[in-house]
């Protein structure tokens, strides 16, 4: 049989082989061991041998131990040479006095498996590993061969001749031996028994193969440590080398195996990595531990590289070699600069081998503030567990009987997924080496099917690898999509040629039903092409409520029937009632009450489809990180083991309509019965802090009820570990793409539209959601909108690193955190609520019925629309802070304003004011014209006599930012959180002692966006908390604001309220204001937009200071508005320039920019004219429109033909308006490149005498001068060597007391905007005695040829260097002719 066949799949895990065995052969190479007939005979013989196993004696055990300590060399031998080599090997070791009876090696292998070397449970059938079974085979073989077991002499091959039974015994034992070695080698590898795998090279660590032992003090050991220890158990050098050869057989089959001679002891072998590096993603400040094993003869030399740069032993980077073959690289404290591709290179005279892995250091910034406090903390000496973003939901359902164990299954959302999501780590599984630059495109992350509601933002993203240049195109239904404001095509280039992966994104700013279809991303290069396809489903606004019915038919076939839900709900309420208030907060999500209860009934049918995991055993003895009832809890880091990309999930079921109606009726009856009693106070939803760090053991133990094993709902509610753990690999998507966007299915348990990081983490400007009342309306009739009571409420900041797409098939359920959150502060009672205020804990008493519990969880009134017309989340009033009823405006009489345009404006304003409450109740949205009027005129631009209080004035100044502005805000925050800050004047200082119960900063109240007029005061206010007390930094447009600023007043109160105030705003104050809070636990930032509008130039009265009653007169008709009798144009407003530039003077050749801002309804069109002639856009003239409505005419470069009178004309249906300015183009300054009037001369000087090197150069503008000696720049003057320059172009280098070291070539360079020129000369320094022997004989110089002309053009003036008068006389003492061309 083949020597390598048993090892070609050395790295395959047991779970893979178990799965393959159902459909194909158990092991691909077994056919090389035995024929099918021989296998059958061997197994029959094995059964008979087992029957004799009871008669085994203790002597055989001694015999096995002797054999094991002697020579395991034949583990790696070809079976046909096994006996011969055993004899030869034993004869080569006469000094070894131990007995070496020749036995087949299954006993030795068995000994190694059952020895204390491996503490793991064998991953194979106990039948195959029972020592009695293998010993029985040996005894049967001995009886067949008639060989005494006490013979000490080694046997020769002819002595081994036995009957056919002996040969069959030998083959059966060899088969078991090979299987045992395969299983033994496969177990420590980083695959888990349930089939989840990592790549053999450069793959991410799989989360399920991290047993709790990894986090103990010995956690830094390699997962292959069993092999290493087994190798160290082998005492003799021959045995060790043989084991290495056995490992060599395990390399991937694309490497050639060297033929093995009879004696493999000293045969040279090229290095091979038998254990490769693994990619990691760790938090900043954690320890990075890379290890690999390499074999080779002679022992290879191992070197480490990071991004091609060799690493050496330093205090920060420790490189070790243990046991000759285990090589480790440890970074004691990792920082973001350590991110990169690490390569280990092993070389010896026979060849070389490499292994590489990616190490990504997640910065300790507040971008991931919601989840960063879940950073994995391992004990000293432990390898930090890789952090990964995950969107999977794993529900572990415990059975009522402790004997039946648990079943783990995953659930898929109701969508239209057809393709599986490829793991982002798949691109790392490629051959090492430098030959990876030529390959066709490969999609490492496919597009995902998406379903959205009309008007939402859609992000389609995929990742592709391939040899550059990659051409990426997008298609919809076969038609190519061009980049436009509606369909933005983004392509992020790879960060290095070593990892040529591009991120391709298609962003649809606002979706309409006609946008639905099949979207295809096509990537091609010179070596091939690839495509990725996904389907986009757009539900129109009027069918939004039924979308849940139409989308959920894909994966329901396994879950059709459900028992009646009331008993389930009773279980849920009882289980919840026993929890602490902080635990209740985790699970009071509007959908969890029903979905958990319904889901726990599905798994009776799904138990037969477990993923290769024994139903009563779980995974590694754990039930998704929660131990069985008779086991101790694992460490928190085990609970938090994350996943990188989950497999596709099974479908979430729908309840039977009859059951649904039953529930509705029951809830309605109980609500009507409870209406006679005082209703429980609705609990407010204060801004929730980010998740605290993982609690210690006692806290986890306290979270577990002390009763019998938890009910299924308890497991379901807390089984998903760290669903929002941070970690972006090389890409950060702007925050506005994860604004709250919900599909709104018809019932509370329908499919939500996005993951927790998208639906419950809206963009930063969203206010806290309004608390909904509990009216007796069937809660199942309202869509799944905002989630007002989710533990990570809407005010939690949304992280800029890449969240899942808008609708991710793998992120279906908002998952409660594993750890309890701190209890929220009590709500501020309003006058109408004061009598009913109660603590959150009183809402969930034992006396509540299941239906009352559900009705308390689910909002009864229709929630506000999740998004506005722009696709952004709508703001609603925070709970506990009811909107103050505004006073009735005193409206001017109709007679006063009839016949003017003010009637239209006033009508619009009245609609806008009184429509706000309707908007919050989900009523029809504003029309396009109303929205434009609101945006252009401002919320406070009513044309009536309006007396307002200051707080109402401030409230009316708030406005919503556009998606483009939000994108800019996200980029600013992302950069700021990763940039150093100025610590001057900071009153908060941190010590080195870590704070107990530390908590990263979080915002209890965020900054708002304001739109004001020039000269008005403005105050940005927010409230921040954290432990220890965070430091606060303010920025404007990314630049830090000094606390000592005269223009801004920065304050911070004891309760954490921070404010930035300016008394009189100017146009320069327009911008984005960011506050960043930082403490040792992390950073977080929040941004408010301030739009400052210029005061109306057409006679608007100046704004009165805040605090005084503000009276505005009705807007008068503008003087240039035309005839008084022109008809009213309803809903149309004539253009009006809010900003216009004045006359400009620009130098010829420079850039000229003219900015203006115009308002009007409908939006005006702008055109530009120069001296009455239209300005056409071309390469030098560009017309741009920015997001904030600023129009720009950009001219680059400006020429004399561009001078003149420019007129900007704004036109819409209501009329037109214009302004003019004059552009004066100044003459271009004359530039002349530098030129040497007098050049440097070769000079000689006696030792100790001063010398001057001088020249003269002219140019316009005056050039800069640079001196060089040989190749060293002379940057500054010293006492001995000084550089001088005057206004007439004279340049001098003065050396006081020249020495031999001053001799050499000197170059002077002159540079200005027009060019650069250089000149070179030589300085020679000779000793004193040369001066007496100088010759006065004139010297002749042969004219130089033209071959030096090229050097002269480059600044080397060779002719000047060899002029007769320039040569010192000591060079011509012995020659009358200087060969200038030979110098």
UniProtKB/Swiss-Prot annotation:
Residues 1137-1226, 1236-1326 are annotated as: Interaction with EZR. Residues 676-696 are annotated as: Interaction with SORBS2, SPIN90 and SRC. Phosphorylated predominantly on serines and, to a lesser extent, on tyrosines. Phosphorylation at Ser-1118 by PKB/AKT1 modulates cytoskeletal organization and cell motility. SUPFAM superfamilies: Immunoglobulin (SSF48726). Keywords: Actin-binding, Cell junction, Cell projection, Cytoplasm, Cytoskeleton, Disulfide bond, Immunoglobulin domain, Phosphoprotein, Repeat. Residues 562-566, 819-823 are annotated as: Interaction with VASP. GO terms for cellular component: actin cytoskeleton; actin filament; axon; cytosol; excitatory synapse; focal adhesion; growth cone; lamellipodium. Residues 1-22, 52-169, 183-238, 609-653, 673-728, 740-846, 1096-1125 are annotated as: Disordered. Residues 677-697, 797-807, 817-830 have a biased composition (Pro residues). Residues 766-831 are annotated as: Interaction with EPS8. Residues 271-360, 440-539, 1001-1085, 1135-1226, 1233-1324 form the Ig-like C2-type domain. Residues 210-223, 745-763, 1098-1108 have a biased composition (Low complexity). Residues 833-890 are annotated as: Interaction with ACTN. Induction: Isoform 3 is expressed de novo. Isoform 4 is up-regulated by TGFB1 during myofibroblast differentiation. Residues 646-676 are annotated as: Interaction with LASP1. CDD domains: IgI_1_Palladin_C (cd05893), IgI_2_Titin_Z1z2-like (cd20972), IgI_Myotilin_C (cd05892). Residues 78-96 have a biased composition (Basic and acidic residues). It is found in: Cytoplasm, Cytoskeleton; Cell junction, Focal adhesion; Cytoplasm, Myofibril, Sarcomere, Z line; Cell projection, Ruffle. InterPro entries: Ig-like_dom, Ig-like_dom_sf, Ig-like_fold, Ig_I-set, Ig_sub, Ig_sub2, Palladin_C. Cytoskeletal protein required for organization of normal actin cytoskeleton. Roles in establishing cell morphology, motility, cell adhesion and cell-extracellular matrix interactions in a variety of cell types. May function as a scaffolding molecule with the potential to influence both actin polymerization and the assembly of existing actin filaments into higher-order arrays. Binds to proteins that bind to either monomeric or filamentous actin. Localizes at sites where active actin remodeling takes place, such as lamellipodia and membrane ruffles. This is Palladin. The gene is PALLD.
